[in-house]
């Protein structure tokens, strides 16, 4: 139970007979209002055609996609070039110099997903929000529900739930660290309050 609500996952059996999780269809279907997705390059090289391509070989690059307000579902499929250090989503972005943010980090080399925050070092959180994950073919299906400061992420068949305290609304975007990524089937949807 979290704040009076139960977070529900649907169990799914993997090919090796272990269990994974996925977002229940009823939750996904509650997000019905399509929100605008507009790529705004911030750092690095970003372009959109049939897919969104991001490249930053020597550091951090990111592009803004839209606004977070109320309950929002992000969905997309991420592919990365071999050697890419990290990629993922920028969440609750604020300020002209990215003064506030959370990240859903996908780290292929380390085989994990994690949530990091702008104030993680100097803040009051003394633990890491991360999960081990297996990646196939340099690709991951990403779903993220943002409800106020609650984040519920599904990456392939692994879930990670956390809070970004002191952050509300703001922007949402994509990032890459030392590599090249491709996002396809990117959607933002608003849900019921």
Show where each model-derived region lies:
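Extracellular glycan-recognition regions
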Residues: 1-193
